[in-house]
Amino acid sequence: MTSSRFGRLAPGVRDVLPAEAHLMRGLKEKFTKLVETWGYKEVVTPTFEYMENLASEELQEEKFFKFLDRQGHLMALRPDMTRPMARLVATRMKGITPPLRLFYLANVFNYEQPQVGRQREFYQAGVELMGPSSPEADAEVVAMVAEYLMQTGLADFQISIGNVGIFHGLVKQLGLPKEVAQELKEALGNKDFVKVEEILGSHAATPEEARRTLDLIELRGGPEILDRAFGLAQPGPAADAIDNLRQLYWGLTCYGVERHITLDLGLLRGLDYYTGLVFEGYTVAMGFPICGGGRYNQLLAKFGLPMPATGFAVNLERVLVALERLQGPPREPVPDVLVAWEDNSLANALQCVKELRYQGLKVVTAMFEYPPAKAKAEARSLGASRVIYFDKEGKSEELSL
């Protein structure tokens, strides 16, 4: 008996038809071309690995796609690419002198509630810059993702940048217990500043300290907020993180991308391996971040190679959806030329096809003998702009459309 699921797709995955596939391939090709001009080299990691390579405190186990191999080992599909990239460098490239500039194009898997822009399987394009720990390295990856988003046609995007050192410095300064710090982190991540104010009011030493802390983490805008931030922060880790942001912003102005940058001193991302810079990119056409990244100086050490690193990932599915909303549905690729033939002229027609394809043209060959009128109708149906017709004498002519 045939299952009721036969012929259907599981929730959270989808088929990609020619028009979208063509647009997606274009996004991948633009990404590859761009990052290679910045000196980045492509690597490929397995789609699944041992669960212990991918698991961490911040990645909830129920979000993984897991299975047992025939030896009983627990395996999982990769939920992101940062940990696989860290493992790869720490185990396979540890003898290479840094900096290492690497990029990837990969599908990743998260077991979550499907909706537009949030699938269980989706494609990422990303880079990792491993070795340098400077603000200049962070500026390189942020400027690179900004340049890529510009090349996709998303002119209205903004990248919010912050530094988790501000949060950790404030937690230390306030002496917050671990569970309270986690509660504060979740409230900040949800931009629930009412809850943030409630937590600070209950645990800060004085109302003034609570107000100064809240004022600091609510700061958002251009470089003008940094002077205000320095005035609110006490000397220590939080002030150091603000200074790091100042240096980073200066680097981004050197790249000429500052109009796409917003400073957000309360920005946190969901993954605990970030140690400094964090950032997320947004566009008006998409309610979720289209890209994100940051600095993770401790992750490679978990695989035996202490090395600072920074990087980003672009969610190509979300970029595709945003482009469709802004520009309309993508168009299917069409051939440049239809070559049609009659009687015994197929050999001549195929020689012509070969020469045209050698010139880089997209050429479709008629599958049957066509009279000229049928060839022209077929060309219009395909969207071809030219028709070359071979008669029974083997002579060719270009038919007008």
Curated annotation (Swiss-Prot):
GO molecular-function term, one example from the UniProt record: histidine-tRNA ligase activity
GO cellular component: cytoplasm
InterPro entries: aa-tRNA-synth_II, aa-tRNA-synth_II/BPL/LPL, HisRS-like_core, HisRS/HisZ, HisZ
A GO BP annotation: histidyl-tRNA aminoacylation
Biological role stated in the UniProt entry: Required for the first step of histidine biosynthesis. May allow the feedback regulation of ATP phosphoribosyltransferase activity by histidine.
PANTHER family: HISTIDINE--TRNA LIGASE, MITOCHONDRIAL-RELATED, HISTIDYL-TRNA SYNTHETASE
General remark: This function is generally fulfilled by the C-terminal part of HisG, which is missing in some bacteria such as this one.
Subunit and interaction comment: Heteromultimer composed of HisG and HisZ subunits.
UniProt similarity note: Belongs to the class-II aminoacyl-tRNA synthetase family. HisZ subfamily.
Official protein name in the record: ATP phosphoribosyltransferase regulatory subunit
Organism: Desulforamulus reducens (strain ATCC BAA-1160 / DSM 100696 / MI-1)
